Protein backbone atom coordinates (compact mmCIF):
# COMPACT_ATOMS: atom_id res chain seq x y z
CA UNK A 1 0.00 0.00 0.00
CA UNK A 2 1.34 3.42 -0.96
CA UNK A 3 2.24 5.67 1.93
CA UNK A 4 -0.09 8.67 2.21
CA UNK A 5 1.64 12.05 2.50
CA UNK A 6 -0.60 15.05 3.14
CA UNK A 7 0.66 18.56 2.48
CA UNK A 8 -1.04 21.77 3.57
CA UNK A 9 -0.05 24.35 0.94
CA UNK A 10 -0.20 28.16 0.94
CA UNK A 11 -0.10 30.57 -2.02
CA UNK A 12 -0.26 34.36 -1.56
CA UNK A 13 2.32 35.77 -3.97
CA UNK A 14 0.05 38.31 -5.67
CA UNK A 15 -3.71 38.82 -5.51
CA UNK A 16 -5.08 35.34 -4.79
CA UNK A 17 -5.21 33.88 -1.29
CA UNK A 18 -5.17 30.11 -1.65
CA UNK A 19 -4.83 27.14 0.69
CA UNK A 20 -4.94 23.49 -0.38
CA UNK A 21 -4.56 19.99 1.00
CA UNK A 22 -2.73 17.69 -1.40
CA UNK A 23 -2.19 13.94 -1.17
CA UNK A 24 1.12 12.57 -2.48
CA UNK A 25 1.59 15.60 -4.71
CA UNK A 26 -0.95 14.39 -7.26
CA UNK A 27 -4.40 14.33 -5.65
CA UNK A 28 -6.29 17.51 -4.73
CA UNK A 29 -8.34 17.02 -1.57
CA UNK A 30 -9.16 20.72 -1.41
CA UNK A 31 -8.04 23.89 -3.18
CA UNK A 32 -9.59 27.07 -1.81
CA UNK A 33 -8.96 30.27 -3.78
CA UNK A 34 -10.13 33.71 -2.61
CA UNK A 35 -9.65 36.14 -5.48
CA UNK A 36 -9.31 39.91 -5.19
CA UNK A 37 -9.98 40.87 -8.81
CA UNK A 38 -12.97 43.08 -8.00
CA UNK A 39 -10.89 45.15 -5.57
CA UNK A 40 -8.10 45.79 -8.08
CA UNK A 41 -10.13 46.29 -11.28
CA UNK A 42 -10.81 49.98 -10.72
CA UNK A 43 -7.06 50.60 -10.42
CA UNK A 44 -6.27 48.72 -13.65
CA UNK A 45 -3.88 46.37 -11.86
CA UNK A 46 -2.82 44.96 -8.51
CA UNK A 47 -2.28 47.46 -5.68
CA UNK A 48 0.23 45.79 -3.29
CA UNK A 49 -1.13 47.39 -0.10
CA UNK A 50 -4.70 46.39 -0.96
CA UNK A 51 -3.56 42.86 -1.82
CA UNK A 52 -1.79 42.42 1.53
CA UNK A 53 -4.84 43.55 3.49
CA UNK A 54 -7.07 41.11 1.63
CA UNK A 55 -4.64 38.25 2.34
CA UNK A 56 -4.80 39.04 6.05
CA UNK A 57 -8.60 38.94 5.94
CA UNK A 58 -8.79 35.68 3.98
CA UNK A 59 -5.89 33.47 5.08
CA UNK A 60 -7.51 31.98 8.20
CA UNK A 61 -10.87 31.45 6.47
CA UNK A 62 -9.18 29.72 3.55
CA UNK A 63 -7.13 27.49 5.85
CA UNK A 64 -10.15 26.36 7.84
CA UNK A 65 -12.15 25.74 4.68
CA UNK A 66 -9.32 23.76 3.06
CA UNK A 67 -9.01 21.44 6.08
CA UNK A 68 -12.78 21.04 6.36
CA UNK A 69 -13.26 20.27 2.66
CA UNK A 70 -10.41 17.73 2.72
CA UNK A 71 -11.89 16.20 5.90
CA UNK A 72 -8.55 16.29 7.73
CA UNK A 73 -7.13 18.08 10.74
CA UNK A 74 -3.64 19.23 11.65
CA UNK A 75 -2.76 15.85 13.15
CA UNK A 76 -3.20 14.20 9.74
CA UNK A 77 -0.70 16.48 8.01
CA UNK A 78 2.89 15.57 7.12
CA UNK A 79 4.19 18.94 5.93
CA UNK A 80 3.37 22.60 5.34
CA UNK A 81 4.43 24.04 1.97
CA UNK A 82 4.45 27.75 1.15
CA UNK A 83 5.34 30.08 -1.70
CA UNK A 84 8.18 32.33 -0.49
CA UNK A 85 8.91 34.01 -3.84
CA UNK A 86 8.84 35.50 -6.35
CA UNK A 87 5.98 37.97 -5.91
CA UNK A 88 4.86 41.01 -3.95
CA UNK A 89 6.75 41.09 -0.67
CA UNK A 90 3.76 42.15 1.44
CA UNK A 91 1.56 39.46 -0.07
CA UNK A 92 4.20 36.75 0.26
CA UNK A 93 4.74 37.56 3.92
CA UNK A 94 1.12 36.78 4.81
CA UNK A 95 1.36 33.24 3.47
CA UNK A 96 4.85 32.69 4.85
CA UNK A 97 3.83 33.89 8.31
CA UNK A 98 0.71 31.71 8.37
CA UNK A 99 2.65 28.65 7.23
CA UNK A 100 5.39 29.21 9.80
CA UNK A 101 2.85 29.61 12.60
CA UNK A 102 1.10 26.35 11.71
CA UNK A 103 4.37 24.45 11.22
CA UNK A 104 5.60 25.62 14.62
CA UNK A 105 2.32 25.04 16.48
CA UNK A 106 1.87 21.51 15.13
CA UNK A 107 5.54 20.49 14.87
CA UNK A 108 5.40 20.01 11.11
CA UNK A 109 8.24 20.41 8.59
CA UNK A 110 8.12 23.72 6.71
CA UNK A 111 8.79 23.32 2.98
CA UNK A 112 9.70 26.43 0.92
CA UNK A 113 8.42 26.54 -2.68
CA UNK A 114 9.38 28.71 -5.64
CA UNK A 115 6.16 30.07 -7.12
CA UNK A 116 7.36 29.33 -10.67
CA UNK A 117 8.08 25.70 -9.78
CA UNK A 118 4.50 25.60 -8.58
CA UNK A 119 3.24 26.69 -12.00
CA UNK A 120 5.25 23.90 -13.64
CA UNK A 121 3.88 21.27 -11.28
CA UNK A 122 0.29 22.35 -11.94
CA UNK A 123 0.68 20.18 -15.05
CA UNK A 124 1.50 17.21 -12.80
CA UNK A 125 -2.23 16.84 -12.19
CA UNK A 126 -2.66 15.99 -15.89
CA UNK A 127 -0.06 13.22 -16.14
CA UNK A 128 3.29 11.81 -15.07
CA UNK A 129 6.38 13.93 -15.63
CA UNK A 130 9.21 12.59 -17.78
CA UNK A 131 12.75 13.94 -17.71
CA UNK A 132 14.53 15.72 -19.18
CA UNK A 133 11.72 18.15 -19.94
CA UNK A 134 11.20 21.72 -21.10
CA UNK A 135 8.66 24.10 -19.55
CA UNK A 136 7.26 27.22 -21.19
CA UNK A 137 6.13 29.44 -18.30
CA UNK A 138 3.97 32.36 -19.36
CA UNK A 139 2.37 34.54 -16.70
CA UNK A 140 1.68 38.11 -15.66
CA UNK A 141 5.10 38.49 -14.08
CA UNK A 142 7.27 35.99 -15.94
CA UNK A 143 7.93 34.55 -19.37
CA UNK A 144 10.57 31.82 -19.23
CA UNK A 145 11.81 28.69 -20.93
CA UNK A 146 12.95 26.34 -18.17
CA UNK A 147 14.98 23.21 -18.87
CA UNK A 148 14.62 20.46 -16.27
CA UNK A 149 17.25 17.71 -16.67
CA UNK A 150 15.71 15.87 -13.72
CA UNK A 151 13.12 16.27 -11.00
CA UNK A 152 13.84 19.20 -8.67
CA UNK A 153 16.37 20.75 -11.09
CA UNK A 154 15.46 23.98 -12.90
CA UNK A 155 17.58 25.88 -15.42
CA UNK A 156 16.38 29.02 -17.21
CA UNK A 157 17.58 29.01 -20.82
CA UNK A 158 15.45 31.95 -21.98
CA UNK A 159 13.39 34.72 -20.39
CA UNK A 160 11.84 38.08 -21.15
CA UNK A 161 14.20 41.04 -21.23
CA UNK A 162 11.44 43.48 -20.25
CA UNK A 163 7.66 42.98 -19.97
CA UNK A 164 6.24 39.53 -19.35
CA UNK A 165 3.62 38.39 -21.85
CA UNK A 166 0.79 38.60 -19.32
CA UNK A 167 1.89 42.08 -18.30
CA UNK A 168 1.71 43.19 -21.94
CA UNK A 169 -1.83 41.79 -22.20
CA UNK A 170 -2.95 43.84 -19.20
CA UNK A 171 -1.28 47.02 -20.45
CA UNK A 172 -2.82 46.90 -23.90
CA UNK A 173 -6.08 45.88 -22.28
CA UNK A 174 -6.18 49.25 -20.56
CA UNK A 175 -5.80 50.98 -23.93
CA UNK A 176 -8.74 48.96 -25.25
CA UNK A 177 -10.84 49.68 -22.16
CA UNK A 178 -10.79 46.06 -20.98
CA UNK A 179 -11.07 45.38 -17.26
CA UNK A 180 -8.08 43.86 -15.41
CA UNK A 181 -7.09 41.09 -15.93
CA UNK A 182 -7.38 41.51 -19.68
CA UNK A 183 -6.03 38.21 -20.99
CA UNK A 184 -9.29 36.26 -21.23
CA UNK A 185 -11.17 39.06 -23.04
CA UNK A 186 -8.34 39.71 -25.52
CA UNK A 187 -8.12 35.98 -26.24
CA UNK A 188 -11.87 35.92 -26.98
CA UNK A 189 -11.68 39.05 -29.16
CA UNK A 190 -8.66 37.67 -31.03
CA UNK A 191 -10.69 34.63 -32.09
CA UNK A 192 -13.12 37.01 -33.85
CA UNK A 193 -10.49 39.14 -35.61
CA UNK A 194 -7.66 38.94 -38.14
CA UNK A 195 -3.95 39.77 -37.95
CA UNK A 196 -4.23 42.90 -40.09
CA UNK A 197 -1.77 45.20 -38.27
CA UNK A 198 1.35 43.02 -38.45
CA UNK A 199 2.85 44.17 -35.15
CA UNK A 200 6.57 43.48 -34.54
CA UNK A 201 7.83 40.06 -33.47
CA UNK A 202 10.74 41.17 -31.30
CA UNK A 203 13.79 38.89 -31.07
CA UNK A 204 11.98 36.17 -33.03
CA UNK A 205 14.99 35.45 -35.25
CA UNK A 206 17.76 36.19 -32.74
CA UNK A 207 20.04 33.30 -31.86
CA UNK A 208 18.80 32.86 -28.29
CA UNK A 209 15.67 31.83 -26.42
CA UNK A 210 14.90 35.22 -24.86
CA UNK A 211 11.75 37.28 -25.32
CA UNK A 212 10.83 40.97 -25.47
CA UNK A 213 7.32 42.40 -25.43
CA UNK A 214 7.87 46.10 -24.63
CA UNK A 215 8.32 47.01 -28.31
CA UNK A 216 5.10 45.23 -29.23
CA UNK A 217 3.29 47.02 -26.42
CA UNK A 218 4.61 50.41 -27.60
CA UNK A 219 3.73 49.69 -31.25
CA UNK A 220 0.21 48.72 -30.24
CA UNK A 221 -0.32 51.82 -28.07
CA UNK A 222 1.08 54.12 -30.78
CA UNK A 223 -1.17 52.57 -33.43
CA UNK A 224 -4.28 53.14 -31.31
CA UNK A 225 -3.30 56.66 -30.22
CA UNK A 226 -2.41 57.75 -33.77
CA UNK A 227 -5.76 56.47 -35.02
CA UNK A 228 -7.54 58.33 -32.21
CA UNK A 229 -5.81 61.58 -33.23
CA UNK A 230 -7.00 61.08 -36.80
CA UNK A 231 -10.50 60.36 -35.56
CA UNK A 232 -10.22 56.85 -36.99
CA UNK A 233 -11.95 53.93 -35.30
CA UNK A 234 -9.95 50.70 -35.39
CA UNK A 235 -11.55 47.27 -35.15
CA UNK A 236 -10.98 45.98 -31.61
CA UNK A 237 -11.14 42.36 -32.73
CA UNK A 238 -8.44 42.88 -35.37
CA UNK A 239 -6.31 44.78 -32.85
CA UNK A 240 -6.61 41.93 -30.36
CA UNK A 241 -5.91 39.31 -33.02
CA UNK A 242 -2.85 41.18 -34.30
CA UNK A 243 -1.43 41.65 -30.82
CA UNK A 244 -2.05 38.06 -29.79
CA UNK A 245 -0.63 36.65 -33.01
CA UNK A 246 2.60 38.55 -32.43
CA UNK A 247 2.90 37.19 -28.88
CA UNK A 248 2.08 33.63 -29.90
CA UNK A 249 4.43 33.63 -32.91
CA UNK A 250 7.39 34.55 -30.72
CA UNK A 251 6.51 32.13 -27.91
CA UNK A 252 6.02 29.25 -30.33
CA UNK A 253 9.11 30.02 -32.44
CA UNK A 254 11.41 30.21 -29.42
CA UNK A 255 9.94 27.08 -27.86
CA UNK A 256 10.38 25.03 -31.04
CA UNK A 257 13.97 26.26 -31.35
CA UNK A 258 14.68 25.31 -27.73
CA UNK A 259 13.29 21.83 -28.36
CA UNK A 260 15.53 21.53 -31.44
CA UNK A 261 18.58 22.19 -29.28
CA UNK A 262 17.57 20.41 -26.06
CA UNK A 263 16.41 16.82 -26.56
CA UNK A 264 13.59 16.31 -24.05
CA UNK A 265 10.91 13.74 -23.32
CA UNK A 266 8.17 16.26 -22.56
CA UNK A 267 7.04 19.88 -22.95
CA UNK A 268 5.11 21.59 -20.15
CA UNK A 269 2.93 24.64 -20.77
CA UNK A 270 2.06 26.50 -17.57
CA UNK A 271 1.36 29.90 -16.02
CA UNK A 272 -1.62 32.24 -16.18
CA UNK A 273 -1.25 32.90 -19.92
CA UNK A 274 -1.19 29.12 -20.52
CA UNK A 275 -4.99 29.39 -20.29
CA UNK A 276 -4.92 31.29 -23.60
CA UNK A 277 -6.77 29.23 -26.21
CA UNK A 278 -4.81 30.71 -29.10
CA UNK A 279 -1.48 29.75 -27.51
CA UNK A 280 -2.66 26.24 -26.65
CA UNK A 281 -3.89 25.63 -30.19
CA UNK A 282 -0.68 26.93 -31.78
CA UNK A 283 1.57 24.81 -29.59
CA UNK A 284 -0.61 21.75 -30.23
CA UNK A 285 -0.17 22.32 -33.97
CA UNK A 286 3.56 23.04 -33.85
CA UNK A 287 4.36 20.10 -31.59
CA UNK A 288 2.57 17.70 -33.95
CA UNK A 289 4.38 19.17 -36.95
CA UNK A 290 7.90 19.74 -35.62
CA UNK A 291 8.25 17.51 -32.54
CA UNK A 292 5.66 14.73 -32.89
CA UNK A 293 7.62 12.41 -30.58
CA UNK A 294 7.57 14.88 -27.67
CA UNK A 295 4.31 14.80 -25.67
CA UNK A 296 3.00 18.08 -24.25
CA UNK A 297 1.32 18.48 -20.88
CA UNK A 298 -0.74 21.64 -20.47
CA UNK A 299 -1.65 22.80 -16.99
CA UNK A 300 -5.42 22.40 -16.43
CA UNK A 301 -7.29 25.62 -17.18
CA UNK A 302 -8.50 25.92 -13.59
CA UNK A 303 -4.90 25.61 -12.32
CA UNK A 304 -3.22 28.05 -14.72
CA UNK A 305 -3.80 31.01 -12.41
CA UNK A 306 -2.27 31.26 -8.95
CA UNK A 307 -3.48 28.53 -6.58
CA UNK A 308 -2.21 26.46 -3.68
CA UNK A 309 -2.77 23.07 -5.36
CA UNK A 310 0.22 23.73 -7.62
CA UNK A 311 2.28 24.73 -4.57
CA UNK A 312 1.28 21.49 -2.88
CA UNK A 313 2.42 19.49 -5.92
CA UNK A 314 5.80 21.25 -6.05
CA UNK A 315 6.01 21.18 -2.26
CA UNK A 316 5.65 17.41 -2.22
CA UNK A 317 8.62 17.10 -4.60
CA UNK A 318 10.65 19.45 -2.40
CA UNK A 319 9.60 17.51 0.70
CA UNK A 320 10.78 14.23 -0.88
CA UNK A 321 14.11 15.86 -1.73
CA UNK A 322 14.63 17.04 1.84
CA UNK A 323 13.99 20.77 1.36
CA UNK A 324 13.24 22.31 4.75
CA UNK A 325 13.05 25.88 6.00
CA UNK A 326 13.51 27.21 9.51
CA UNK A 327 11.19 29.59 11.28
CA UNK A 328 13.43 32.38 9.99
CA UNK A 329 12.10 31.80 6.44
CA UNK A 330 11.49 35.16 4.78
CA UNK A 331 9.79 36.31 1.61
CA UNK A 332 12.11 36.64 -1.40
CA UNK A 333 10.23 38.79 -3.94
CA UNK A 334 12.95 38.49 -6.60
CA UNK A 335 13.49 34.73 -6.28
CA UNK A 336 14.63 33.12 -9.55
CA UNK A 337 15.73 29.81 -10.98
CA UNK A 338 19.38 29.64 -12.04
CA UNK A 339 20.13 30.98 -15.51
CA UNK A 340 22.39 28.82 -17.66
CA UNK A 341 24.25 29.63 -20.86
CA UNK A 342 22.20 28.65 -23.91
CA UNK A 343 23.50 25.94 -26.20
UniProtKB/Swiss-Prot annotation:
GO terms, molecular function: iron ion binding; N(6)-L-threonylcarbamoyladenine synthase activity
Record keywords, A-Z: Acyltransferase, Cytoplasm, Iron, Metal-binding, Transferase, tRNA processing
Cofactor(s) demanded: Fe(2+)
Record-given protein name: tRNA N6-adenosine threonylcarbamoyltransferase
PANTHER family noted in UniProt: TRNA N6-ADENOSINE THREONYLCARBAMOYLTRANSFERASE (PTHR11735), TRNA N6-ADENOSINE THREONYLCARBAMOYLTRANSFERASE, MITOCHONDRIAL (PTHR11735:SF6)
Role according to the record: Required for the formation of a threonylcarbamoyl group on adenosine at position 37 (t(6)A37) in tRNAs that read codons beginning with adenine. Is involved in the transfer of the threonylcarbamoyl moiety of threonylcarbamoyl-AMP (TC-AMP) to the N6 group of A37, together with TsaE and TsaB. TsaD likely plays a direct catalytic role in this reaction.
Compartment annotation: Cytoplasm
Record: residues binding Fe cation: 115, 119, 306
Known EC number: 2.3.1.234
Catalytic activity entry: L-threonylcarbamoyladenylate + adenosine(37) in tRNA = N(6)-L-threonylcarbamoyladenosine(37) in tRNA + AMP + H(+)
InterPro entries with a match to the protein in the record: ATPase_NBD, Gcp-like_dom, KAE1/TsaD, Peptidase_M22_CS, TsaD
Amino acid sequence: MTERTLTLAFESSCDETSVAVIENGTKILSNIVATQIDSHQRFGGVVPEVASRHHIEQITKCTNEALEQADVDYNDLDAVAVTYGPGLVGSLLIGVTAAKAIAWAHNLPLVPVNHMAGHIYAARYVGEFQYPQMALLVSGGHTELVYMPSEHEYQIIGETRDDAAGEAYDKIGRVLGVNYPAGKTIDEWAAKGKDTFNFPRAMEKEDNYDFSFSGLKSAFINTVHNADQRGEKLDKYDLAASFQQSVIDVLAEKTMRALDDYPVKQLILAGGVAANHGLRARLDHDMKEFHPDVPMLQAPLKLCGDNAAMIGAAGYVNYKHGDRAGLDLNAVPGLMFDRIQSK
